[in-house]
A protein has these predicted regions:
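C-terminal target-recognition/interaction regions appended to catalytic cores
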Residues: 284-419
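Conserved beta-strand signature within the Rossmann-like core of class I S-adenosyl-L-methionine
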Residues: 182-194
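A conserved mid-domain beta-alpha-beta active-site/ligand-binding segment of alpha/beta enzyme cores
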Residues: 204-260
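A short, conserved alpha-helix within the catalytic core of class I
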Residues: 166-176
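Short amphipathic alpha-helix with an adjacent loop that forms part of the alpha/beta core around
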Residues: 140-153, 175
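A short SAM/SAH-binding and catalytic strip from SAM-dependent methyltransferases
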Residues: 156-168
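SAM cofactor-binding core of SAM-dependent methyltransferases
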Residues: 29-144, 365-376
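Conserved beta strand-loop-helix elements of the APE1-like EEP
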Residues: 267-277
Length: 419
């Protein structure tokens, strides 16, 4: 974590910014959702997991007049609380086998965190299931990947990469993580405004830009967008695509955290290869709506920016509040008929999973929003929902990923779905 927070034994604690509070809250809450998702089977008694904090810092901050736990302590505490609940509610108990890697390039940070963990009662676990590494994340990563692979075949792992800027984590390294493990997820902080301000032909061949695989032509193409209407949105949109393509992530959730302290925006990018992981992160943004924004529209294809359109129409900053929910539901209701009709013309219907998976990356829409609107269209007689076994679901509120959306044989004269 370069440039903002510093720790040293005997020195005052760094002051935690409001945007970092939001990130830490997301980290802790997502851990809880993640574990709950993977332990839904009542007979399950064990889960293997590795949690990696690639820019751990010293583990303690000051906010106002109080000490505040940093990400290492919050991650440890979240796992402990979840294991206690699982052990108390499962007849045969539960063993949550979580290993932790806390990595930082600054020796003072490592010494500070080690001291904090000892004071908090974790001394016996250091070197057993809590591993502290004094190294750059990229240097420590090969050993971490080897550890995860040895731990089991599922290779479930969460990488929290809370870098201060935008170039400390090479995109090739994220590509390696996502490509070499079976079930990894990456949460990456990315200082997009700082990158946009840095972009110029003069800086085109710096190592920082090479780390995120932007070459001279890429930089030139991005800087050429400057000056036109909505240029910042255009550059952000191009960077979305670039990061997804370079990391190989099938699913990503790009949302903004605004830093009042620096007056700049950061991305919190969730990268994974699993549809369910993406959906859960999207739902979490709706629940923790105080600090998060999405720059774009309300429905599907919300990040596909058209420079010919008036920026004031549909491209306003999107907050995760009640008004945003209403806008999302209205937009999805407007877009779904065309999407379903086109799929039915090409084939025998559209799987709910295919509909969501092929459209979820560029949208704040979650499966809950989608299912509510599908049920509405069905109840209006605009579509039929068919279960995997071929039976109809005329009234069921449970719309599954394997259900198929088909046009009914008869529709109203004013059908939204057309012919």
């Amino acid at each position: 974590m370069r440039g903002q927070y510093t720790w040293k034994l005997g020195r005052p604690l760094p002051v935690l910014g409001g945007h970092s509070v939001a990130k830490h809250e997301i980290f802790e809450q997502y851990i809880k959702i993640y574990i709950e998702r993977l332990t839904r089977t009542p007979s399950q008694t064990m889960l293997n997991l590795t949690i990696v904090d690639g820019f751990s810092g010293g583990g303690l901050y000051r906010r106002g007049s109080t000490e505040v736990d940093g990400s290492p302590l919050r991650l440890l505490r979240a796992i402990e609380g979840l294991e206690d609940v699982l052990k108390s509610t499962r007849a045969k108990g539960f063993d949550l086998r979580a290993d932790f890697f806390f990595i930082d390039e600054n020796l003072h940070h490592v010494e500070f965190l080690t001291d904090v963990l000892r004071q908090r009662g974790y001394a016996q676990r250091l070197g057993r299931d809590i591993f502290i590494r004094h190294a750059l994340f990229e240097e420590a990563c090969p050993d971490v990947l080897a550890h995860i692979k040895k731990k089991g075949t599922a290779q479930r792992s969460l990488f929290f990469l809370d870098q201060y800027g935008w170039s400390d984590v090479g995109l090739s390294l994220i590509r390696k993580i996502l490509g070499s493990l079976r079930n990894p997820e990456v949460l990456l902080t990315f200082a997009v405004d700082a990158l946009i301000n840095f972009l110029s032909v003069k800086t085109a061949e710096t190592q920082a830009l090479l780390n995120i695989e932007l070459d001279r032509e890429d930089v030139r193409a991005l800087t050429d967008l400057r000056g036109g209407e909505g240029w910042r949105y255009l550059i952000q949109n191009s960077l979305y695509r670039h990061i997804q393509n370079c990391t190989g992530a099938r699913f990503y959730t790009p949302f903004f955290i605004h830093s009042a302290e620096s007056r700049r925006s950061y991305w919190l990018l969730h990268l994974s290869n699993h549809r369910q992981a993406r959906d859960e992160m999207g739902k979490l943004h709706w629940r923790l709506n105080n600090h998060f924004q999405h720059h774009g529209g309300a429905g599907f294809h919300a990040l596909g920016f058209d420079p010919s359109k008036d920026l004031r129409q549909g491209m306003l900053t999107f907050m995760f509040d009640d008004d945003a929910m209403r806008r999302s539901e209205a937009a999805v209701l407007e877009q779904l008929p065309r999407m379903i009709h086109e799929a039915n013309r090409a084939s025998g219907g559209l799987l709910v999973e295919d509909l969501f998976a092929s459209n979820c990356n560029d949208t704040p829409v979650t499966s809950d929003i989608l299912r509510r609107q599908l049920a509405f269209l069905r109840d209006e007689g605009e579509l039929s929902i068919v279960a995997p076994d071929g039976s109809g679901k005329p009234r069921s509120k449970n719309i599954g990923w394997g259900d198929r959306l088909v046009l009914p044989p008869e529709r109203s004269l004013f059908s939204r779905l057309g012919w």
